[in-house]
């Protein structure tokens, strides 16, 4: 299983929230001018929305929109959180038939102050992921006994 812990911006969730991403879309893939649907990579068989089973109990399950830059305005695709890497990881896992789990810490509101908020919230994200990781390990040990 490939596990991605990372940071995200969101218009839907408050800073400090950890979410479990189980759907992934490319938020900046737009070749609609060539007749393709928003989010579709031309001449690929991969669907624009990738979905994986939810694996993090107790966390909100969300759709993640990945792209190449910080979001500071309204999005053209529907997603709950925004990052720069999860879709690519999900795509590789789909191509390789690997399981994929993704948890994100909301560092910013995906707005004009996203870059500054992201930077100042990184230490909180690291601490939150350490706690999440330790709880997953403890739960796994309990499940084995």
Report residues per predicted region.
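Glycine-rich phosphate- or other oxyanion-binding loops that anchor nucleotides, phosphorylated ligands
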Residues: 1-144
């Amino acid at each position: 299983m490939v596990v991605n812990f990372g940071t995200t911006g969101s218009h839907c969730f408050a800073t400090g929230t950890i979410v479990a991403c189980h759907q992934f879309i490319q938020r900046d893939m737009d070749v609609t001018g060539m007749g393709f649907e928003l989010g579709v990579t031309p001449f690929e068989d991969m669907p624009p929305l990738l979905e994986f089973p939810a694996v993090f109990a107790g966390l909100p399950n969300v759709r993640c929109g990945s792209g190449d830059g910080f979001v500071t305005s309204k999005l053209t695709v529907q997603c709950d959180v925004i990052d720069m890497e999860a879709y690519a990881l999900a795509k590789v896992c789909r191509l390789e038939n690997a399981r994929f789990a993704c948890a994100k810490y909301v560092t910013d509101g995906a707005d004009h102050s996203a870059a500054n908020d992201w930077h100042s919230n990184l230490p909180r994200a690291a601490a939150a992921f350490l706690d999440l990781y330790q709880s997953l390990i403890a739960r796994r040990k309990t499940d084995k006994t």
